[in-house]
A protein has these predicted regions:
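Conserved active-site and SAM-binding loop architecture
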Residues: 1-122
């Protein structure tokens, strides 16, 4: 999945459509910033999909799709470091410093020195 090793941040991420294309092209997501709670939850679900698929545990994702496990049970299978890449906050003067700090923390935890691309929805 990480063929080219390039990293990105997704601003105004929505439900993650742009991220889907970047992930499928081998980019590594650093953070997804989205103010809508439900769109952020969709991104978390996609993170779960890619994590489980990449770790040979895709069966758990299919169990979730079939209603055999709850969303909470699904997300408990995913490392917190992966899920915290979803920053569910509105970007404003009041929140921007906290968002930058959260992104810096994620970069440090992932050992990322630079972000290669910043993408954003309309």
């Amino acid at each position: 999945m990480n063929e080219n090793g390039l990293s990105y941040i997704d601003l105004f991420a929505g439900a993650g459509g742009l991220s889907e294309g970047f992930i499928q092209s081998g980019y590594r997501p650093i953070a997804h910033v989205e103010m809508n709670e439900y769109a952020s939850q969709t991104i978390e679900t996609r993170i779960a999909y890619y994590y489980l698929k990449g770790n040979g545990k895709i069966k758990s994702y299919y169990e979730y799709q079939k209603g055999q496990i709850t969303r909470k049970q699904l997300l408990e299978l995913i490392p917190k470091e992966e899920l915290k890449t979803v920053i569910n906050k509105e970007m404003s003067e009041a929140t921007i410093k906290g968002i930058f700090n959260a992104i810096d923390d994620i970069k440090e935890e992932k050992g990322v020195n630079q972000v290669d691309v910043i993408i954003g929805g309309p």
